[in-house]
Amino acid sequence: NITIFGESAGGHNVLSLLAAPQAKDLFQKAISQSGYTTSYTKEEALGKNDVQQLNDLGSLSVFSDSNVSSLSKGKIKNFNSEDLEIQRQFLKSLSAESIMQIYLDIEKNTRDYMPLLNRDDIVISSNGLLKDLADSNLSKDIPVILGSNKDELSLWLGVHKYFVKVIYPFTRLIPIPRIKILDPNLYTSWVKIRSDAWKYRGVDEPLIALEKAGYRKLFAY
């Protein structure tokens, strides 16, 4: 009688397991708090297609660095067509430290997000996570709870210089800040709109998809 639970990226993982055919019968209940259904195509995960650069944090930028691997760009670009065992052996041979360092170096000069969940037709189909959740052939028909927090985005907006001013009344030597909201109405409006948007993409949309797939015990908070 196993219940899986995750928050934020963990909620994303819970939704992924609900869609993954390989996870069938491995758990009996699922809870996702503040999750989301973002998934990336193979090209987006690679970071480049035949026409343009799609994402500086894609695999092509990382694996092309000589500190990570000796693969040529042509080899990396066709990496997804390799046998899965060859892919596994290659990835296992890499240094985790060197991979992370390259990501840290690249992200200083980009606003791109690291591709996380890929529509690779291995776990998540090329249709994407949200459509897979609505697929009755992938339904696990177990009790599912999805939820979000009323002021979800206050965690980020509450420290953003556009909305608040941070004052150190005891000087920075005693780091006890006092936070002053510059425009309370503007701040409240942004928090509500962005938090409602998170609820829509992390609760409402996936629950609608699960209902289409035939789930009978769905709950939201």
Predicted regions and their residues:
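Alpha/beta-hydrolase fold nucleophile elbow
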Residues: 1-8
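Structural beta-sheet core signal
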Residues: 4, 144-146, 220
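Catalytic nucleophile loop
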Residues: 10-14
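Substrate-access "cap/lid" subdomains that shape
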Residues: 16, 24, 29, 33-166, ...
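Residue-level recognition of short, well-ordered coil/turn positions
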Residues: 22-25, 215
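A solvent-exposed, charged loop/short amphipathic helix patch at secondary-structure junctions
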Residues: 161-189
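Conserved beta-loop-beta element that borders a ligand/cofactor-binding pocket
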Residues: 213-221
